[in-house]
Design a protein with these regions (language model features):
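Long, charge-patterned amphipathic alpha-helical coiled-coil/hairpin "stalk" segments used as oligomerization
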Residues: 93-198
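Flexible, glycine/charged-enriched surface loops at secondary-structure junctions
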Residues: 39-43, 200-212
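Residue-level signature of catalytic and energy-coupling elements of molecular machines
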Residues: 27, 88, 133, 215
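Generic N-terminal amphipathic, Lys/Arg-enriched alpha-helix
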Residues: 3-17
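Flexible glycine-/small-residue-rich
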Residues: 47-49, 80, 118-119, 176-178, ...
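Short, charged, intrinsically disordered terminal tails
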Residues: 1-3, 225-233
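Translation machinery proteins
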Residues: 22-86, 107, 113
Length: 233
């Protein structure tokens, strides 16, 4: 069943040549010409990947620092004690603690965007799997959120490091900034994300990996991006 689209979306869709594939810079320029909204939309690069999400050895997951940040204020929670806890606080983490924070999360506290933990804390933090897991907040060594260097992890997240993960349909969607960003900043953030997703290609993936790439804003249609420049990374 066709979804009811807003007048703004339909106006943007009429401007877009859906048969055309743009280089990234032109795709961003096209996106920025769409009718503005009353709020600062998030801009997202979305991928359709040639992998089988049912196969554990074809999982695509990783992190990417955005050269120009995400434009979002990220609230960070850190499970740590001692010097690691002190370092996290000094780096700007909003919530730092151990047993008190674990209990708080068990009671339903979710007012944060990223959770970081020291390796020593993980024995206790794993008990929160059913709470943090469904929201994608469980600390993980592969995304740099399980580390003894809590200060560095907090600083990177605050500066605009984004995480990406393959969904059950074989897609990945990564925010690359805000609609208010300059075109150059959005293009450079987008380029960094595309390169990161390409480098995260599983060794077991066969055939074409980047089946489709689009860039869109919260209330806009997707603009197709040419994946050709990234195929030999």
């Amino acid at each position: 069943m066709q979804r009811n689209r807003s007048k703004r979306y339909r106006a943007a869709a009429q401007q877009l040549d859906r048969s055309k594939i743009y280089n990234l810079a032109d795709a961003v320029s096209t996106l920025k010409k769409f009718p503005p909204t009353k709020f600062d939309q998030t801009v997202t690069v979305s991928f359709r990947l040639g992998v089988d999400p049912k196969q554990s050895d074809q999982m695509v997951r990783g992190t990417c620092p955005l050269p120009h940040g995400s434009g979002k204020q990220v609230r960070v929670l850190v499970f740590a004690e001692g010097e690691a806890a002190k370092a996290a606080k000094e780096a700007g983490a909003e919530f730092v603690g151990m047993k008190d924070l674990i209990q708080k999360c068990q009671e339903g506290f979710q007012d944060f965007d990223v959770a970081i933990a020291t390796p020593a804390a993980m024995a206790e933090v794993r008990k929160l799997g059913k709470v943090l897991g469904p929201r994608g907040l469980m600390p993980n060594p592969r995304t740099g959120t399980v580390t003894d260097d809590t200060a560095k992890a907090v600083q990177e997240v605050k500066a605009g490091r984004v995480e990406f993960k393959l969904d059950k349909n074989g897609n990945v969607a990564v925010p690359v900034g805000k609609f208010s960003f300059e075109e150059k900043a959005l293009a450079e953030n987008g380029n960094a994300v595309i390169e990161a997703v390409v480098r995260a290609r599983p060794a077991t993936a066969k055939g074409r990996y980047l089946e489709g790439v689009t860039i869109s804003a919260t209330m806009s249609p997707g603009v197709r991006v040419d994946p050709a420049p990234y195929l030999n990374i």
